[in-house]
């Protein structure tokens, strides 16, 4: 990532986004904030293409996501992904990485276990005619759990998803056993628009686990949820 370049921030680089709605901004600037109840400064970076971020960071994200799959408690995948499979899944359209830094660009060769706080992707939930309804997947670095990183990731999502042209958010599978996740969406006034009974066969549970379907209108987000102060 070139500190002097603006190309990596341009929404014109968005791939596989909403078909009928254009981004609301020409660029997405890195977003800086402090972790809740802490003086730790974090910065969220938009990722329109993996060519703009270090290979070492991609490799760390790849490893981190496969560990989450292997835990068998939050994502529906059964087997670890290949490197290309991960790239196709996480970076299909747009992703975000949040680092513990006050820099406005991503430096190479960092200790990602210490620096990476979390990541998420945003992509259409449906085929082109309904592609303005987005889905997202979130991942907090286990080394930083307990710092309310997940809530900050959710706030960045609410700030940036509308800028990409999305009008509505749908989360298809929030397992009822994933309390850390559903507490965030309830707190941010996402609506519980459905329940999938016996949705997942998860590790550590003897019976299939239900999943909540969440929805939220991205054109009417409460201002207090967007504030990162």
UniProtKB/Swiss-Prot annotation:
Disulphide connectivity of cysteines: none
GO molecular function: any one? azetidine-2-carboxylic acid acetyltransferase activity
* Temperature dependence comment: Optimum temperature is 35 degrees Celsius.
Record-listed substrate binding positions: 135, 172-173
Field pH dependence: Optimum pH is 8.5-9 for azetidine-2-carboxylate and 6.5-7 for (S)-1-pyrroline-5-carboxylate.
GO cellular component terms attached to this protein's record? cytosol; mitochondrion; nucleus
Positions bound to CoA: 145-150
Q: Per the record, what are the reactions this protein catalyses?
A: L-glutamate 5-semialdehyde + acetyl-CoA = N-acetyl-L-glutamate 5-semialdehyde + CoA + H(+)
Tell me, what does this protein do in biology?
N-acetyltransferase involved in oxidative stress resistance. Acetylates the toxic proline metabolism intermediate (S)-1-pyrroline-5-carboxylate (P5C), or more likely its spontaneously forming tautomer glutamate-5-semialdehyde (GSA) into N-acetyl-GSA for arginine synthesis in the mitochondria. P5C has been shown to increase the levels of reactive oxygen species (ROS) in the cell by inhibiting the function of the respiratory chain in the mitochondria. The enzyme is able to reduce intracellular ROS levels under P5C-induced oxidative stress and protects cells from damage by oxidative stress.
Fill in the subunit field for this protein: Homodimer.
What family does the entry list?
Belongs to the acetyltransferase family.
Entry protein name: N-acetyltransferase MPR1
């Amino acid at each position: 990532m070139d500190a002097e370049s603006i190309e990596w921030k341009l929404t014109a680089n968005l791939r596989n986004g909403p078909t009928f709605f254009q981004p609301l901004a020409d660029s997405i600037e890195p977003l800086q904030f402090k972790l809740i109840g802490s003086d730790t400064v974090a910065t969220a970076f938009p990722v329109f293409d993996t060519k703009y971020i270090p290979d070492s960071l991609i490799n760390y994200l790849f490893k981190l996501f496969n560990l989450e799959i292997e835990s068998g408690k939050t994502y529906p995948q059964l087997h670890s992904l290949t490197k290309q499979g991960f790239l196709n899944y996480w970076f299909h359209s747009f992703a975000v990485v949040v680092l513990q830094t006050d820099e406005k660009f991503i430096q190479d060769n960092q200790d990602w276990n210490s620096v990476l706080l979390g990541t998420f992707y945003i992509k259409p939930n449906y085929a082109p005619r309904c592609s303005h309804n987005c889905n997202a997947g979130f991942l907090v670095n286990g080394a930083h759990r307990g710092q309310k990183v997940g809530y900050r990731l959710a706030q960045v999502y609410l700030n940036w998803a509308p800028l990409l042209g999305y009008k509505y958010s749908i989360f298809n599978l929030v397992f009822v056993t994933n309390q850390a996740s559903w507490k965030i969406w309830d707190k941010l006034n996402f609506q519980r628009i459905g329940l999938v009974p016996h949705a997942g066969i998860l590790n550590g549970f003897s019976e299939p686990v239900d999943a909540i379907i969440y929805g939220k209108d991205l054109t009417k987000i409460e201002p207090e949820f967007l504030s990162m102060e």
